[in-house]
A protein has these predicted regions:
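Structural signature of cysteine-dependent C-C bond-forming condensing enzymes
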Residues: 47-57, 100-101, 140, 171-177
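Condensing-enzyme catalytic core mediating Claisen C-C bond formation in acyl metabolism
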Residues: 71-135, 140-143, 177
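A glycine- and small-aliphatic-rich helix-loop capping segment at beta-alpha/alpha-beta transitions
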Residues: 13-23, 45-47, 68-77, 168-173
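Active-site-proximal alpha-helical scaffold in enzymes
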Residues: 27-55, 94, 128
Length: 177
């Protein structure tokens, strides 16, 4: 099992597997946790270290608000750039055999810090790394946006999405349309 969540010490994921007798790798990538767990799982399978991996993530709106922004009980007004964390969970079983969808390739990103320090505008903070990773993936795989049915990121918010689209456009790729 490879998994994580948005809370300190990935406590939810760790407690979820506490009685599981197999191996567990905890990952913490905030908005990228699901993609990160699937990339790690795919690498483990491709490298011959596992035949199957279960990749999971979860998040909880109120817990994320308390940890990253303001507890809801404070009644603080949200800024227009604040993200909306989902309350939910998801998982995927990756296997070295079968006929399901295929994890064909993936690209690990890099940290790009442009100095954004507003905790209510994490989309602007994440946009440079998101756009860099998207473009690096196109270059590494010799693909273009038209080769994909869907390109997803974590919640960049409206402003972060706008910044990401512009940065990707400056690199020569058009994601809209």
């Amino acid at each position: 099992v490879i998994g994580g969540d948005l809370l300190n010490q990935i406590i939810s994921a760790s407690f979820a597997v506490k009685d599981y007798e197999g191996s567990y790798v905890g990952v913490y990538g905030a908005c990228s946790t699901m993609a990160e767990s699937m990339l790690v799982g795919g690498c483990m399978i491709d490298g011959g270290f596992a035949d199957k991996t279960v990749c999971v993530t979860s998040s909880h709106f109120c817990s994320a608000e308390r940890q990253y922004r303001f507890p809801l009980e404070m009644g603080t007004q949200r800024t227009p750039t604040a993200q909306w964390t989902v309350t939910g969970a998801g998982g995927a079983l990756l296997s070295s055999e079968g006929r399901g969808p295929v994890l064909e390739s993936g690209t690990f990103g890099t940290v790009i810090d442009m100095g954004v320090s507003d905790a209510n505008n994490m989309g602007a903070a994440m946009a440079p790394a998101a756009s860099s990773t998207i473009c690096a993936h196109f270059e590494a795989t010799k693909t273009t946006p038209q080769d994909y049915d869907l390109i997803l990121t974590g919640d960049l918010g409206m402003l972060g999405k706008k910044i990401t689209l512009e940065l990707v456009r400056r690199s020569g790729y058009e994601l809209e349309g």
